[in-house]
A protein has these predicted regions:
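Alpha-helical transmembrane segments and immediately membrane-proximal extracytoplasmic
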Residues: 1-439
Length: 439
């Protein structure tokens, strides 16, 4: 008799009325004296502390490298710093098989078989993510954070002997813990447990684990003094909401969809270029470093994740003008594609937000009568939904960053819903055209 069968036989399923989930071992037995949710709590704390420490090191070293007076006064220093870290990224990928963003995303891995997560690459994940970010590449920290958190859960699950069927609880707990701490919302990634798993039994286990882990991560970061992304852009709209905003936010959501489609086209172009470097990972990373360096010498505000740079743009968008802001958005997305397709490790969230906000600011300069938070909320939510395919998570993220009240939250929901309805038709048209092309 297997362990799973033994646990099922010892479980009072008729008392709970939920025999399927109980049969998976979510009880205390003689063979397993610790309840699974004790492990969920432990890995949530471990994940939050580890990710907070990783972020602290990143921010301190990044400040030392890039935010000193000498570097800011001498743009020619950009390649001096960027290229060695780009070389390190290439070496780690080629000779140590460090994780990259060339395959599936973190959300893709969560919706698949989490038991396939390779915890032995945790040290490489830590170093590769740091090197990618220190290079100035247009990539956010969330990709590295997700990898670190998930691998901590996988390591804990294997060493403690957690049954395979329960390890998804640990992974969702640590992921939610890390991301909720980063965003500073107790609910943000808790919805991952509801949106990503397709198996109802898996969803029934991961949802509570996500909520528990997310709350713990939020509290750990809060206790450490992290403000996260609350009121991230510090907007102060002075116009009242108008009935026309209901229609406008739908248009802005669809504009975000267009921006996401442009992003996809840029990714395909970057893939065509950097795909020629298969087996030459070092040269591929160095080429990307040269591109980043060239842009950094001319326009350093377009490099890095954009997490802090966008706040400077929001502070004085008129200094750039509509045309330049649109150009900045496109260049940012192109550089994001370069980073992803050349083997750098990170996430797309902050660069995508940078681009969406730049487009919104450009439109606000042209149409100053429209509330800026409606513009940003619609475009940002529309583009991020196409990116993540997780509507509740996107709504929560956008609402947190804009410090949205009920009115703006309702408008954000409309923008996301409009994109959800429209996107399948666009994908069907694209698929039809591809099928019609001669082989």
């Amino acid at each position: 008799m297997s362990d799973r069968d033994g646990d099922a036989a010892a479980t009072p399923v008729d008392v709970t009325g939920s025999g399927d989930d109980r049969a998976l071992g979510e009880t205390v037995t003689a063979a397993r004296p610790v309840h699974p949710y004790v492990h969920v709590v432990i890995v949530a704390v471990l994940g939050a502390v580890a990710v907070f420490a990783w972020l602290w090191v990143y921010e301190e070293v990044n400040r030392l490298l890039w935010e000193n007076a000498f570097v800011t006064a001498n743009p020619w220093m950009f390649p001096v710093i960027c290229l060695p870290f780009s070389l390190l990224v290439g070496l780690l990928v080629k000779y140590r098989h460090a994780p990259t963003m060339l395959g599936e995303s973190m959300l893709d891995s969560l919706s698949g078989d989490v038991s396939a997560i390779k915890w032995r690459t945790l040290p490489l994940n830590v170093v590769a993510a740091w090197a990618s970010l220190f290079s100035g590449a247009v990539i956010g920290p969330e990709g590295g954070i997700g990898g670190i958190a998930s691998k901590i859960a996988a390591l804990y699950g294997e060493k403690v002997g957690i049954p395979i069927e329960l390890r998804s609880m640990l992974v969702f707990s640590t992921i939610s813990s890390a991301y909720n701490g980063l965003v500073a919302s107790p609910l943000f990634s808790g919805v991952l447990g509801a949106e990503l798993p397709t198996d109802p039994k898996v969803k029934a286990r991961t949802m509570p684990a996500s909520l528990v882990g997310g709350a713990i991560g939020y509290l750990v970061f809060f206790a450490a003094g992290s403000s996260g992304l609350q009121n991230y852009l510090h907007l102060s709209p002075d116009q009242p909401y108008k009935p026309v905003d209901v229609l406008l936010v739908v248009v802005f959501g669809l504009l975000g969809l267009v921006l996401a489609l442009v992003t996809g086209a840029l990714f395909r172009a970057a893939s065509a270029v950097f795909g020629r470097f298969e087996g030459r990972e070092v040269e591929r990373a160095l080429l990307a470093g040269v591109i980043f360096s060239a842009v950094g010498v001319v326009a350093p505000i377009l490099l890095f994740s954009g997490e802090t740079q966008i706040q400077a743009v929001v502070g004085n968008p008129a200094a750039y003008g509509p045309a330049v802001l649109i150009g900045m958005a496109l260049v940012k997305l192109a550089l994001l594609a370069v980073a992803f397709k050349s083997g750098f490790l990170g996430g797309p969230t902050f660069p995508a937000i940078f681009a969406a906000v730049c487009v919104a600011l450009a439109l606000n300069l042209l149409f100053p009568g429209i509330r800026i938070d409606v513009l940003i909320g619609g475009i940002m939510a529309g583009s991020l939904f196409v990116l993540f395919k997780a509507p509740l998570m996107v709504i929560l993220l956008t609402a947190v960053m804009l410090q949205a009240g009920p009115e703006l939250t309702a408008l954000i929901v409309l923008a996301v819903t409009a994109v959800m309805i429209t996107l399948p038709y666009i994908l069907a048209v694209v698929a039809g055209r591809q099928a019609a092309r001669p082989a």
